[in-house]
Amino acid sequence: MNNQKQQKPTLSGQRFKTRKRDEKERFDPTQFQDCIIQGLTETGTDLEAVAKFLDASGAKLDYRRYAETLFDILVAGGMLAPGGTLADDMMRTDVCVFAAQEDLETMQAFAQVFNKLIRRYKYLEKGFEDEVKKLLLFLKGFSESERNKLAMLTGVLLANGTLNASILNSLYNENLVKEGVSAAFAVKLFKSWINEKDINAVAASLRKVSMDNRLMELFPANKQSVEHFTKYFTEAGLKELSEYVRNQQTIGARKELQKELQEQMSRGDPFKDIILYVKEEMKKNNIPEPVVIGIVWSSVMSTVEWNKKEELVAEQAIKHLKQYSPLLAAFTTQGQSELTLLLKIQEYCYDNIHFMKAFQKIVVLFYKAEVLSEEPILKWYKDAHVAKGKSVFLEQMKKFVEWLKNAEEESESEAEEGD
């Protein structure tokens, strides 16, 4: 028996054809570029004709594969080399953003070209966002006029939702920030964005991508202050953006104040230390006293676990608030602060149903402890209260208010007799 393995026959000199689906098309952006530029040259500067050409070409050319090349051409007139320069040996077109007039109306017209293209070929959306992020990193490679056009275009595209505000991350590039390119670009961008929408819409878009608290990073670390930001953008004609950032900073400072205040209270820090800290924060962050009393009130009320039984919670509240009266009194030196506190108490007692019967007792306690005075209480009773539970609370306060009025009249007549 032959134990040797039988040799398998081989086919020599035979060539096998690769299946069509296994063939990989060669990546050739130059050929794609030539087709697009030739078409744009034929359409000329009529942007409606450009939009129609791009719409029709998507059926013949591979936009999905050559998205970056397509957008390079539409923005810069040709394929961009790293750093943002146009290759000398490549074809170029003047039918592009950078060769257009430097005005908002022209950029709005170009924005429509991008809108139509991306609406027609939805898969280009991601590629376009990546392109804009790249272009922002290349800003130093562009002329000032090119940067201005790109900024205006980006602002319009952010306003109409073609772009997501996350693209602004590219502006926080260290080199762009250090050389002042980011801040200058942001001025033009926000002007066109706010011109299309308003500051509230801009703020909502920034909040959506957690960019609302990062705008100061457009400046180097040594210039990241509210004062510098507001001065720079107000002088550039963007007062509403300056005010928005100032408000954001104030909101952040208030949250930080409340957090620190609650920690100090839970540690049992002396009131004099807490008062000193709060007053320093008020001065540093320009927080008015009526705002601070609201923060102190909610901090005081959140430091205790309240009894769920209505008949016991009033007694517990009075005991707790009596202890904190000196702290509250330190921040009711203005009539408006007292009125704010009264409204906070009203809202708290309404929102926490077990406190509904405690409202009058809390107000009387604060009157005796000189946290509240007659005039704001009478004003609250007459016309400064809010709708929440007003019939219940006004009824509770009726006798005390009558007593206050009588006491006031008696003191007035005593003063007249003394004269």
UniProtKB/Swiss-Prot annotation:
There is a cross-link at residue 368 (Glycyl lysine isopeptide (Lys-Gly) (interchain with G-Cter in SUMO2)). GO terms for molecular function: cadherin binding; RNA binding. Pfam families: HEAT_5MP1_2, W2. PANTHER family: BASIC LEUCINE ZIPPER AND W2 DOMAIN-CONTAINING PROTEIN, EIF5-MIMIC PROTEIN 2. Residues 1-26 are annotated as: Disordered. The modification N-acetylmethionine is found at residue 1. It comes from Homo sapiens (Human). The lineage of its organism: Eukaryota, Metazoa, Chordata, Craniata, Vertebrata. Keywords: Acetylation, Activator, Isopeptide bond, Phosphoprotein, Transcription, Transcription regulation, Translation regulation, Ubl conjugation. This is eIF5-mimic protein 2. Belongs to the BZW family. Residues 1-15 have a biased composition (Polar residues).
